[in-house]
């Protein structure tokens, strides 16, 4: 059941797709933060206290905003200026998308020209956020490879912790 005119549906679809990419990027920042912390553990010698601490860290990462995660990462590692700029631009555009995009365009959504401008802007925001996601993903993968950790998702990490508790 779609009561929106087709061009409006397309705009909302593009907005949703861009917001989804922002969430994927945030999730990858969390994966990188967890990868940074995981290098402190030897998976062959992890004890229950370390498991609880790691679970606590995962819970903390889940509650952080993207900006807070970036600050956590910046405290732990030195990041090149190019990467810093890429990720900072994505953070800025993510915040604009979530908090100000529709407010800025206000009545523009009601005209073809306005929707066109909004679509162009959403494409730009998507590209910026997608690039930051790719950079964060590559950083996570590289860190995991450097320390011999498998590249697994947060869900897989939680499952390993659950298995270790019951195993």
Regions found by a protein language model. Give the residues of each.
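Alpha-helical initiation/capping and key positions within long helical/coiled-coil segments
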Residues: 10, 17, 82, 86-89, ...
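Short, charged/polar, low-complexity loop and linker segments
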Residues: 1-8, 70-78, 112-113
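Flexible secondary-structure boundary motifs
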Residues: 37-88, 92, 96, 100-107
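Short acidic DE-rich linear segments
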Residues: 162-167
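Amphipathic alpha-helical interface elements
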Residues: 1-64, 88, 138-160
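Short secondary-structure subsegments characteristic of cysteine-rich extracellular domains
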Residues: 110-130
């Amino acid at each position: 059941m779609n009561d929106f005119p087709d061009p409006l549906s397309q705009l909302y679809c593009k907005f949703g797709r861009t917001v989804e990419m922002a969430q994927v990027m945030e999730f990858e920042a969390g994966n990188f933060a967890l990868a940074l912390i995981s290098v402190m553990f030897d998976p062959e010698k992890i004890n229950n206290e370390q498991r609880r601490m790691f679970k606590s860290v995962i819970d903390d990462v889940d509650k952080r905003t993207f900006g807070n995660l970036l600050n956590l990462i910046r405290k732990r590692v030195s990041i090149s200026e190019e990467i810093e700029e890429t990720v900072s631009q994505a953070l800025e555009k993510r915040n604009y998308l979530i908090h100000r995009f529709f407010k800025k365009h206000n009545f523009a959504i009601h005209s073809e020209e306005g929707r066109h401008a909004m679509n162009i802007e959403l494409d730009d925001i998507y590209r910026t956020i997608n690039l930051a996601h790719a950079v964060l993903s590559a950083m996570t993968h590289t860190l995991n490879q450097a320390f011999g950790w498998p590249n697994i998702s947060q869900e897989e990490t939680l499952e390993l912790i659950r298995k270790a508790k019951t195993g």
